[in-house]
UniProtKB/Swiss-Prot annotation:
Transmembrane segments: none annotated. InterPro entries: UPF0509 (IPR020887). It comes from the Bacteria. It comes from Escherichia fergusonii (strain ATCC 35469 / DSM 13698 / CCUG 18766 / IAM 14443 / JCM 21226 / LMG 7866 / NBRC 102419 / NCTC 12128 / CDC 0568-73). It holds the Pfam family YciZ. Belongs to the UPF0509 family. This is UPF0509 protein YciZ.
Length: 58
């Protein structure tokens, strides 16, 4: 499984929350879409890396 930097993720979420508090919902949604795409890309890259799966992941 890929390494997830929880601190970095929390900072990104905090930024989105700050944007929402400021009232710019369009930018907040855009930032969430970017974050989602980055996370899905990491998952896809991990799946293609050929790392053997644990029995419960098959």
């Amino acid at each position: 499984m890929f390494e997830l930097d929880a601190q970095r993720l929390a900072e990104r979420i905090d930024t989105v929350l700050d944007i929402l508090v400021a009232g710019d919902t369009h930018s907040a949604i855009h930032n969430l879409e970017i974050l989602k795409a980055e996370l899905l890309s990491k998952v896809k890259d991990n799946a293609q890396s050929g790392t053997p799966k644990s029995p419960w992941e098959i």
